[in-house]
């Protein structure tokens, strides 16, 4: 296909971002896939299926560096399964324009928060009952957004773990990748039932993405977290602006209703 090399290149970028920032990479994949001609629903489904493979590779790299909090990741991931299942079912019923607006608003909010930065609120023990509920609640909320927008949820989970659970940036990134496996897996299961997943682009994206994520994760802790986060925040804001501009009422097309 004419866009095979585009997908391989996109896989590299996605893998690098996943390994460095602890995100699934959907914020990159979805807008590019839409630009390559896939529908918004197809793009979301392809993105989530790819994230499942790429996040696993990144997780291995962080685990080798002992930068994964498994109890927190498992609790958050369990909540994410519930949320992602609900979100993916909602997404199937929404128009492409509505999904684009949700996606754009998500990027806008997260981009502003990452650019703003700030200090953590302090360490919170996951053994405390209310903090378990907090982690579970974060997982459910992130899961809904994941199912709706086709992102793994790392762009929300990492800031949430840093500012609400008091985690360090790199530990939050590694833990995020563990939770992402649950959200992406749950969303992909629903998308498979709706026959939205196209495996050829998924395999092309994963082919380079898995390798890039594994390598990037090994180098992630050598790069200042603030530099990475704020640079990425600027990119998020640019994509958010473009997405919301194209989804404004005057630009909406009848064909985008599905």
What spans do the regions from the language model cover?
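Juxtamembrane transmembrane-helix boundary motif
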Residues: 1-14, 34-36, 40-42, 60-148, ...
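N-terminal signal-anchor/start-transfer transmembrane helix
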Residues: 8-19, 27-28, 186
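Transmembrane helix boundary and interhelical junction motifs in multipass membrane proteins
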Residues: 21-30, 148-160
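Acidic (E/D-rich), amphipathic helical modules within compact regulatory domains
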Residues: 23, 30, 35, 40-42, ...
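Proline-centered helix-kink/hinge sites
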Residues: 30-31, 53, 158-159, 182, ...
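Short hydrophobic/aromatic, small-residue-rich stretches within specific transmembrane helices
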Residues: 47-51, 73, 77, 176-180, ...
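Membrane-embedded alpha-helical segments of transport systems
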Residues: 49-57, 178-185, 211-212
């Amino acid at each position: 296909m004419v866009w095979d090399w585009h997908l391989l290149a996109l896989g590299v970028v996605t893998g690098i971002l996943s390994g460095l920032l602890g995100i699934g990479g959907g914020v990159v994949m979805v807008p590019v896939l839409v630009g390559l001609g896939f529908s918004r629903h197809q793009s979301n489904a392809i993105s989530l299926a790819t994230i499942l493979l790429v996040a696993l590779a990144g997780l291995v790299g962080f685990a080798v560096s002992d930068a994964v909090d498994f109890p927190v990741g498992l609790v958050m991931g369990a909540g994410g399964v519930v949320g992602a299942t609900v979100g993916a079912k909602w997404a199937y019923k929404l128009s492409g324009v509505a999904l684009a607006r949700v996606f754009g608003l998500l990027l806008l909010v997260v981009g502003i928060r990452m650019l703003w930065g700030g200090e953590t609120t302090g360490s919170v023990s996951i053994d405390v009952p209310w903090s378990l509920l907090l982690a579970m609640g974060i997982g459910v909320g992130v899961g809904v957004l994941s199912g709706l927008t086709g992102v793994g949820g790392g762009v929300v989970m990492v800031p949430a773990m840093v500012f609400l659970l008091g985690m360090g940036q790199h530990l939050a990134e590694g833990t995020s990748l563990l939770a992402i496996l649950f959200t992406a897996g749950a969303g992909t299961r629903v998308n498979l039932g709706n026959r939205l997943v196209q495996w050829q682009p998924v395999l092309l994206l994963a082919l380079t993405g898995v390798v890039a994520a594994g390598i990037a994760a090994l180098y992630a802790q050598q790069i200042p977290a603030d530099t990475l986060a704020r640079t990425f925040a600027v990119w998020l804001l640019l994509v958010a602006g473009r997405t919301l501009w194209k989804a404004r009422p005057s630009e909406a097309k009848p064909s985008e209703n599905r």
